[in-house]
Amino acid sequence: MPAPTCFSCHKTRAALRRPRSGQALCGSCFCAAFEAEVLHTVLAGHLLPPGAVVAVGASGGKDSTVLAHVLRELAPRLGITLHLVAVDEGIGGYRDAALEAVRSQAARWELPLTIVAYEDLFGGWTMDAVARSTAGSGRSRSCCTFCGVLRRRALEEGARLVGATHIVTGHNADDMAETVLMNFLRGDAGRLARGGVLGSTGEGCALPRCRPLQFASQKEVVLYAHFRHLRYFSEECVYAPEAFRGHARDLLKLLEAARPSAVLDLVHSAERLALAPAAKPPPPGTCSRCGALASHKLCQACALLDGLNRGLPRLAIGKGRRVLQVEPPQPGNPSLVTSDPVAPAGPCTCKQPKDKANPCGNGGDRAGATCVSQCDLSPGNGEDRAGATCVSQRDLSLGNGGDRAGATCVSQCDLSPVAE
């Protein structure tokens, strides 16, 4: 049976049938329709006003490559200026090749490119160093948890560096649907409320962010790259298999097989989601350390870096460890963290006996935990794992060993198990 004629131009043989509409289109007409839909998304959502300086998050992958190409085609009509911003996470054997793809794209399309590195922004930390630090620590957070938070912060810093007024990322409809599923499964009402919004800021980000490909399926993104002959980096990150997103992706595939419109249905549902007043998160404040938008005392980036710089996992009980010193941000210093050794704790002033039969109960510590200094653990910092260590006055909301949000240590305290 011969291929049908293109539904749009009625001249050329159709090369595909669009999953969304069922229309048979040739490659040229499909690309034109794809670009028109992205233009409609931007204009209808008032995402990029004329005169905007747009930082395009460029990873070298298919989504950011297609986004940069489409916006370059639409830039004269939108009246915007584009600047590619790439993030070097410090993943050996993976990121170097991806950055080469980004450099090639920037040269081919004559777009300015700025690369910002975790190592420069975050006190020497790279993702490989984070992976080594957290390996075997018993933490529930995957490398992708750290990378997602730090990458958003790095992209924000890169955008500020180039004088951007807006940030765009290449999240497609499948990415958005996976995020909606993840937030439902986690019961994260705050992120559910933000998840379907085309333009938003989010924690740690003051510049407006938007996702022009939010309604474009992953299949159509790949098809656009194919028909436009776009070259991109297609290898998966070495840390991706451990991410929780993979479970949401598998579930989404099952849903899509039973209901082809499931992806867009989830995206539109998130857009229309209305939370009860009691479930709505409070308006964001500012991070006490770096000044970024934050829903707690510390923004997510500073809190994660705080935990990393405390030296977990510890090599042995009682060994020295590096910790984060709580200092106000210094003008002109691009690093978010500084590390220094902490002085040993003072003599124990805890009034309760410290032995296995009658362990220290200051704050509800586990049997066997020994308090070696006065410490107020009233919000629940008594569920610490063996080896969790509070080292100075700070908010432990991110959980040094599983602490609840709001737990604040007011003095040095070692919660290691009692030695034999």
From Swiss-Prot:
InterPro entries registered for this protein in UniProt: CTU1-like_ATP-bd, CTU1_C, Ncs6/Tuc1/Ctu1, Rossmann-like_a/b/a_fold, TilS/TtcA_N
Residues the record lists as Phosphoserine modifications: 200
Summary of the function given for this chain in its UniProt record: Plays a central role in 2-thiolation of mcm(5)S(2)U at tRNA wobble positions of tRNA(Lys), tRNA(Glu) and tRNA(Gln). Directly binds tRNAs and probably acts by catalyzing adenylation of tRNAs, an intermediate required for 2-thiolation. It is unclear whether it acts as a sulfurtransferase that transfers sulfur from thiocarboxylated URM1 onto the uridine of tRNAs at wobble position.
Gene name of the record: Ctu1
Disulfide bonds: none
HAMAP family xrefs: CTU1
Source lineage: Eukaryota, Metazoa, Chordata, Craniata, Vertebrata
Gene Ontology CC annotation, any one: mitochondrion
Stated name of the protein: Cytoplasmic tRNA 2-thiolation protein 1
Annotated signal sequence range: none
Family of this protein: Belongs to the TtcA family. CTU1/NCS6/ATPBD3 subfamily.
Keywords, alphabetical: Cytoplasm, Phosphoprotein, RNA-binding, Transferase, tRNA processing, tRNA-binding
GO MF, one annotated term: nucleotidyltransferase activity
Subcellular location: Cytoplasm
Subunit structure: Component of a complex at least composed of URM1, CTU2/NCS2 and CTU1/ATPBD3. May form a heterodimer with CTU2/NCS2.
Pathway note: tRNA modification; 5-methoxycarbonylmethyl-2-thiouridine-tRNA biosynthesis
Biological processes per GO annotation: protein urmylation; tRNA thio-modification; tRNA wobble uridine modification
Keyword Nucleotide-binding recorded: no
This enzyme's EC code(s): 2.7.7.-
